[in-house]
Amino acid sequence: MRIFVFLVLLTVAIGTENLNSHVFPRPLIIEYPEKQLRDELKCTTWRFVVETNNLSPWKTIPEECADYVKEYMVGPGYKMEIDRVSDEAGEYAKSVDLGDDGRDVWIFDVDETLLSNLPYYSDHRYGLEVFDDVEFDKWVENGTAPALGSSLKLYQEVLKLGFKVFLLTGRSERHRSVTVENLMNAGFHDWHKLILRGSDDHGKTATTYKSERRNAMVEEGFRIVGNSGDQWSDLLGSSMSYRSFKLPNPMYYIL
């Protein structure tokens, strides 16, 4: 008798479960892999402290963040952030009351600010490899780096507004010709001055070198109103601009 009652109850339970499952299907639950989530959060945190200059200096991206950085650089995230920074810079530029003496300056860095070296870094694992200056120089000498579209737009806007544009780059003076050609082919024209590292600048940190060049601008009577760069060393130091705009770059760090 007990066996019969048990079988009846079991049959009813199964039937009810099947009915409920048919009428009210259970939601499909996808369990996000815990390790993948942990790694992504770790890499997001790493990029945050990098972009806020709280992790310095560093030589390569963490190995576990290689896929994360790649997806960020080639996906929509990088472009959206570049666009946002450039849009904010453009709004600021339009708000400035320029003097009548032609002494208001906007400084642009070149690499990862006006020109993109993403084709090079895609072949070098997006910053996972230790920087090789010989290989990078070969890339520079090709003169094929494309423009960052939003930076080109900002560049043209500040020129139209009446700013004098200075290009201040860590590239060597021996790369002047190819840099000029690359910039012009990418759509950049009419800058006031292109400043590259001379023989006396080798061995200096980027912060020191760029500070010295900005000091010279100020001594000549220029007002540094805006500055755009992908490295904190483009922006910090002495004779800083009234406002600086940091473009994202999780692939490498320059002191």
Swiss-Prot record:
Alphabetic keyword roster: Glycoprotein, Hydrolase, Signal
Signal sequence bounds: 1-15
InterPro entries: Acid_phosphat_B-like (IPR005519), Acid_phosphatase_pln (IPR010028), APS1/VSP (IPR014403), HAD-like_sf (IPR036412), HAD_sf (IPR023214)
Keyword Heme set for record: no
Residues with attached carbohydrate: 142
GO molecular function: acid phosphatase activity
Catalytic activity: a phosphate monoester + H2O = an alcohol + phosphate
EC number: 3.1.3.2
Source domain of life: Eukaryota
Keyword rRNA-binding: no
A Pfam short name: Acid_phosphat_B
Similarity comment: family membership: Belongs to the APS1/VSP family.
Name of the protein: Acid phosphatase 1
Top-level taxonomy: Eukaryota, Viridiplantae, Streptophyta, Embryophyta, Tracheophyta
